[in-house]
């Protein structure tokens, strides 16, 4: 079921019940068997942890913070302490909760540079402005049938994201002939309505 917060963010037609909303977006027939049911996107977006792990046992995002530079991590000095990580969050919850936990992880482990808005009064959180896009992309453009663990790695000098995906094209990207393609359109549709992208 949808939480009250998810319901307020997702459902614009307030007269719809939770079940009507989920069926309107995520109900379909399975190819080959013609069995009807909810699509995996519904479970990944709104499911409870146990339901998600039953349907997609490899679904997780491993968020790791290391207080050293990336080069220092790859080539430590003999005098460096043996620190595997300073903070870690193994996230195995639905995508909406994953988004919130990853954003909290970024805010907890990355410095907040002071910046004022154009009006000169309001303070801007550049971390949120930048990383809501990065986090959304790592969650939206993942290949959810792959068992590869999604990784979100923060180092002192860079952030690295890793997720399994099948590219639509190979070779060089031509900026004059660039077209975006949605990897998971149902998940993207819900995230757009949540104003996370």
List each model region and its residues.
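Conserved beta-strand-loop-beta-strand hairpin that lines the nucleotide-binding pocket
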Residues: 6, 41-42, 46-98, 126-194
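Residues that form generic nucleotide/phosphate-binding pockets
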Residues: 21-24, 105, 190
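Helix-hairpin-helix/helix-loop-helix acidic hairpins
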Residues: 91-120
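Long, charged, glycine-rich C-terminal linkers/tails
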Residues: 17-21, 117-124, 152-154
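Extended, Lys/Arg-enriched charged tracts that mediate electrostatic binding to polyanionic substrates
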Residues: 12-52
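Structural motif corresponding to the C-terminal cap of alpha-helices
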Residues: 26-29, 106-114, 142-143
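Single conserved hydrophobic/aromatic residue that forms the stacking wall/gate
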Residues: 1-7, 11, 195-196
């Amino acid at each position: 079921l949808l939480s009250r917060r998810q319901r307020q963010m997702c459902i614009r037609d307030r007269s719809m019940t939770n079940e009507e909303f989920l069926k309107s977006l995520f109900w379909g027939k399975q190819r080959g068997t013609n069995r009807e049911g909810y699509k995996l996107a519904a479970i990944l977006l709104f499911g409870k942890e146990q339901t998600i792990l039953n349907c997609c046992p490899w679904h997780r995002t491993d968020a790791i913070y290391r207080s050293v530079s990336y080069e220092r991590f790859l080539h430590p000095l003999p005098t460096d302490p043996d620190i595997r990580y300073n903070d870690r969050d193994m996230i195995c919850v639905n995508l909406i909760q994953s988004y919130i936990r990853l954003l909290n992880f970024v805010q907890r482990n990355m410095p907040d540079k002071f910046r004022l808005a154009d009006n000169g009064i309001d303070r801007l959180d550049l971390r949120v402005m930048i990383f809501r896009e990065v986090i959304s992309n790592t969650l939206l453009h993942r290949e959810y049938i792959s068992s590869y663990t999604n990784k979100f790695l923060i180092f002192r000098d860079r952030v690295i994201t890793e997720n399994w995906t099948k590219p639509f094209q190979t070779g060089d990207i031509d900026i004059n002939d660039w077209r975006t393609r949605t990897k998971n359109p149902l998940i993207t549709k819900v995230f757009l309505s949540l104003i996370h992208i």
